[in-house]
UniProtKB/Swiss-Prot annotation:
PROSITE patterns named in the record: RIBOSOMAL_S4, S4
Keywords: Chloroplast, Plastid, Ribonucleoprotein, Ribosomal protein, RNA-binding, rRNA-binding
Chief localization: plastid
Organism listed in the record: Bromus erectus (Upright brome)
SMART domains, per the entry: Ribosomal_S4, S4
GO-annotated biological processes: ribosomal small subunit biogenesis; translation
Subcellular location: Plastid, Chloroplast
Protein name, as recorded: Small ribosomal subunit protein uS4c
Amino acid sequence: MSRYRGPRLKKIRRLGALPGLTRKTPKSGSNLKKKFNSGKKEQYRIRLQEKQKLRFHYGLTERQLLRYVHIAGKAKRSTGQVLLQLLEMRLDNILFRLGMASTIPGARQLVNHRHILVNGRIVNIPSFRCKPRDIITTKDNQRSKGLVQNYIASSDPGKLPKHLTVDTLEYKGLVNKILDRKWVGLKINELLVVEY
């Protein structure tokens, strides 16, 4: 299955708020949510919805998500927490959380178009796994800095997670440590995803 490129608001109405997918919010008087939420929720449906939330928020394919679940399953700690840590340490997600892009697909495009440097080297793979003490900067040309400048100016510094720091003047971000569960930007029950 390929990455989802269809209407985003349909997914938000169905699954709830997905800040990584889009900044838009559905109208409050929407009847679609009532229609989908009516009746008894089966266990399979609940698990499927949690998995779909995770997939659409982080912009993953089915195969990528299965690979991350497999890696997290090999870890000695809680599989759900390790899964969220792996997803949160992706380069496209860190750019989104630093405020250098408005959405995760926007951050993915910045990385694919070679505007981002990690530790002084160009990285064009959005799934690049960042480690603590990685320094993320933009290229030293006006076009790259201009793309990031608007997003950094409009981002809220109060929403910045504790495991990241950002220097708004130099367009630079730093990964301090691996994140804690409470700073994940998505309301999700990761155990249901692992059980699915």
